[in-house]
């Protein structure tokens, strides 16, 4: 009796242990998750995964997280393919409208945690992809997973964990692990990680400026692996450091490590055996789950593989590929039977799938104790001089108008931006009248924030398009949600050569960085004393601006107000005060910037090695980040002046471009300064034409030289074009509202006459204002005068700072 009791107790203990280790009792309850959508493509993958789940002996329940729209559910046939938890579809992002189905994975996991009753009774979670075949039980603690230390497979191509990308998206770049595919973690860790996984996926997906292959490892540069980075960056934010393995999950077609038996196959990549091959993307719309007795093309048999491949290691890899394909087909056979399909006819292949040989090949693979190989920490040490803190987010702005003149500049700017590695997002501030917007064709040229045009001032009627820059910045600040810490403000007529970052150029809150505009002599004379309380704080800067967002919020309105103030002060347009050789007030916006910053005592760090004008001799050793082609520049007989292309549509005419600059071999060989100057000028010209070429290619223009393009080339006869444009330059500059040389050909008298012709009433009002102002001031202006002038602009619609 005593022995019977002992035997019963031992048996109970054994059963208890086995139950624990099978994932059925706390604290060893395992739950497996995988995410899919309502598509045939995911249905056949689900059949394969579910069949392998049952064959492998994986402990615990499994749940399919099914993301479907309401319309998809109406016609969906696969509800019975797996235990299912329905989750909202975010394939089309509910806020941004971005089409990115991969985001459904973190959305589904988070929704399951928040709304599933099953999630309340789980200790460990294994997360897989649908395109996987399980070969043996995946037990988290056997893999080495602990609370706070998840287990994951190695994804070596996630290079963003080692470069700029990680510093932009997490405060803990040192914790970023290149992992994915196979994930096993404690439920408590998943609860912390899941919302971060989703939010970081959204962040990376929206950071289109950093989808480039060199930063992400994505060969397509389309941001498709944003969800993978969302996981790694989210885990880093959560403080989770993974135990990483590189041999338990294998891609069919790869050779397994000697002595290692993979427990998971991931058939995300094409694989082949002899003349047979399989690519999952070839079956994107495949109805194979619902077509009775139809299978994927049968692969070779094991004995054929043994004949064709003498190398034992490679042969073992091919056998794994066979197993993957055969398991998929075996699952389809069983699914067809459940669907009520007639019994299939006998074939040699069906006979093999039911054979003892195949059963032995697919017997569950169990991990040997101590066989799990954990990789050492593979983070690359940062360079000694690299910024040690967390990189702040950056947003780049540039201002344009609804004209083809700004459109070709935008094309050049955006092309260079994508190549430069500039961090963060970018926004074009597009100032348009309602009428111009109706006919505008360049909406797709850049991420755009639309701004009401102030080219014609709403109160004074003054024509001054340059005011759109500060007005647009004010509008952007008041009408968008901005999560960037720093803003980089550039001009459209620029070409980026490299990143412009606050950490490299030492910008800080209260200390913006800019480039020198030495011709702003008004900072040193009466002009500054007339327009700012702090003339000693006036910096002669412009072009490139790096500023903290909080500084910009305080400063932007001053920039706009001071621009209006200087523009209205026509008495002081003289070049001896402003440095403007045309004496037209055209650089009022530049002074508006400097005087506005001075009002706040916002002093700049001035860096002369960020920007260069093509045609200028570079400083020795300077690594310029920006070309500013606002002035004419030449190399030999070739020249470029942006003003000559004001009325030429280079964007909507296929293959239109600028005259090609000379070859670099044609530049000065003896004088190194002149050689470097010319090489930079050539680079700028080449970059503009390169941008135009790619633009026309994206627009699907017919091949150059075809009949449809012969008559639209604008750059075949360089001499003729330059001659025609030179002859018409006076008319062009006089008729264009945004011409930078308006003042050269328009005296104050002509302006008054033109205004009178437009509106006699307006003329009388303006003259009354002018005369009343002259009676009320002497040769100098006091603080009261300035305050009065500011008040006169308080109803522009841009002064609401709430």
Swiss-Prot record:
Q: Which portions of the sequence form the region Disordered?
A: 699-741, 777-802
| Gene Ontology CC: one annotated term | endoplasmic reticulum membrane
Q: How does it sit in the membrane?
A: Single-pass type I membrane protein
The chain's disulfide connectivity reads none
Extent of Polar residues compositional bias: 792-802
Protein purpose: Glycosyltransferase involved in the O-galactosylation of several proteins including extensins. Catalyzes the transfer of alpha-galactosyl to Ser residues. Hydroxylation of proline residues adjacent to the serine acceptor is required for activity.
Q: Which residues does the annotation flag as glycosylated? A: 214, 275, 425, 637
Stated name of the protein: Peptidyl serine alpha-galactosyltransferase
Organism, scientific name: Arabidopsis thaliana (Mouse-ear cress)
Q: What is its EC number?
A: 2.4.1.-
* Membrane topology, Cytoplasmic segments: 772-802
Entry's Pfam families? Answer: HPAT
Mainly resides where? endoplasmic reticulum
Q: In the record, what terms sit under GO molecular function?
A: glycosyltransferase activity
């Amino acid at each position: 009796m005593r022995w019977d009791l002992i035997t019963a107790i031992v048996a109970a203990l054994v059963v208890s242990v086995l139950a624990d280790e099978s994932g059925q009792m706390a604290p060893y309850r395992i739950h497996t998750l995988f995410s899919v959508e309502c598509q045939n493509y995911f249905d056949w993958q689900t059949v394969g995964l579910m069949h392998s789940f049952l064959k492998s002996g994986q402990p615990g329940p499994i749940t399919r997280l099914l993301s479907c729209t309401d319309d998809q559910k109406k016609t969906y046939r696969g509800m019975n393919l797996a235990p299912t938890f329905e989750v909202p579809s975010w394939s089309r992002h509910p806020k941004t409208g971005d089409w990115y189905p991969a985001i459904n994975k973190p959305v589904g996991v988070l929704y399951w945690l928040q709304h599933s009753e099953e999630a309340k009774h789980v200790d460990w979670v294994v997360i897989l992809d649908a395109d996987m075949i399980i070969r043996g039980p995946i037990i988290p603690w056997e893999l080495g997973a602990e609370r706070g230390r998840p287990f994951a497979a190695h994804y070596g191509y996630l290079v963003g964990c080692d470069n700029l990308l990680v510093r932009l998206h997490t405060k803990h770049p040192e914790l970023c692990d290149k992992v994915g595919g196979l994930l096993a973690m404690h439920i408590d860790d998943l609860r912390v990680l899941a919302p971060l996984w989703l939010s970081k996926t959204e962040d990376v997906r929206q950071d289109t400026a950093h989808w480039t292959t060199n930063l992400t490892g994505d060969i397509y540069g389309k941001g498709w692996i944003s969800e993978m980075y969302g996981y790694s960056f989210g885990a880093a934010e959560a403080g989770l450091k993974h135990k990483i393995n590189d041999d338990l999950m294998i891609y069919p077609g790869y050779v397994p490590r000697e002595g290692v038996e993979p427990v998971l196959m991931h058939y995300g990549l094409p694989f082949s055996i002899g003349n047979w091959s399989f690519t999952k993307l070839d079956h994107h719309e495949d109805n194979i789950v619902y077509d009775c007795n139809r299978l994927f093309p049968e692969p070779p048999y094991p004995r054929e593989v043994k004949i064709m491949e003498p190398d034992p290691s490679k042969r073992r890899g091919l056998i794994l590929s066979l197993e993957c394909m055969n398991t998929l087909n075996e699952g389809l056979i069983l699914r067809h039977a459940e669907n009520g399909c007639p019994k299939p006819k006998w074939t040699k292949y069906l006979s093999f799938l039911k054979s003892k040989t195949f059963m032995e090949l697919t017997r569950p693979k169990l991990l040997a104790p101590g066989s799990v190989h954990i990789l050492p920490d593979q983070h690359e040490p940062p360079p000694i001089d690299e910024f040690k803190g967390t990189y702040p987010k950056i947003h780049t702005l540039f201002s344009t108008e609804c004209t083809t003149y700004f459109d070709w500049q935008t094309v050049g700017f955006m092309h260079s931006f994508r190549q430069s590695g500039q961090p963060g997002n970018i926004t074009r501030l597009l100032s348009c009248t309602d009428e111009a917007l109706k006919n505008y064709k360049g909406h797709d040229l850049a991420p755009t924030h639309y701004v009401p045009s102030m080219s014609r001032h709403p109160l004074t009627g003054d024509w001054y398009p340059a005011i759109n820059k500060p007005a647009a910045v004010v509008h952007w600040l008041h009408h968008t949600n901005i999560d960037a810490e720093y803003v980089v403000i550039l001009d459209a007529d620029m070409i980026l050569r490299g990143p412009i970052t606050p950490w490299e150029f030492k910008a800080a809150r209260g200390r913006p960085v800019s480039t020198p505009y030495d011709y702003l002599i008004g900072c040193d004379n009466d002009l500054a004393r007339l327009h700012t309380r702090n003339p000693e704080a006036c910096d002669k800067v412009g072009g490139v601006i790096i500023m903290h967002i909080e500084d910009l919020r305080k400063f932007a309105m001053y920039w706009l107000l001071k621009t209006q103030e200087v523009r209205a002060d026509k008495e002081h347009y003289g070049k001896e005060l402003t440095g403007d050789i045309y004496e037209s007030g055209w650089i009022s916006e530049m002074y508006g910037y400097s005087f506005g910053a001075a009002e706040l005592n916002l002093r700049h760090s001035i860096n002369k090695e960020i920007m260069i004008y093509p045609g200028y001799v570079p400083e020795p050793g300077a690594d310029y980040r920006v070309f500013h082609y606002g002035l004419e520049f030449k190399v030999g007989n070739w020249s470029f002046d942006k003003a000559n292309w004001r009325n030429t549509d280079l964007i909507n005419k296929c293959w239109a471009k600028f005259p090609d600059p000379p070859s670099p071999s044609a530049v000065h060989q003896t004088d190194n300064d002149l050689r470097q100057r010319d090489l930079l000028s050539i680079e700028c010209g080449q970059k503009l034409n390169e941008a135009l070429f790619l633009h026309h290619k994206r627009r699907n223009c017919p091949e150059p030289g075809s009949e449809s393009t012969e008559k639209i080339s604008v750059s075949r006869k360089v001499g003729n074009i330059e001659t025609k444009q030179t002859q018409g330059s006076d008319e062009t500059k006089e008729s264009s509202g945004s011409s930078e040389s308006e003042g050269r050909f328009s005296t104050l008298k002509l302006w008054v006459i033109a205004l009178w012709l437009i509106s006699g009433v307006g003329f009388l009002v303006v003259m009354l204002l002018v005369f009343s102002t002259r009676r009320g001031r002497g040769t100098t202006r006091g603080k009261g005068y300035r305050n009065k002038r500011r008040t006169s602009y308080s109803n522009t619609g841009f002064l609401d700072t709430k």
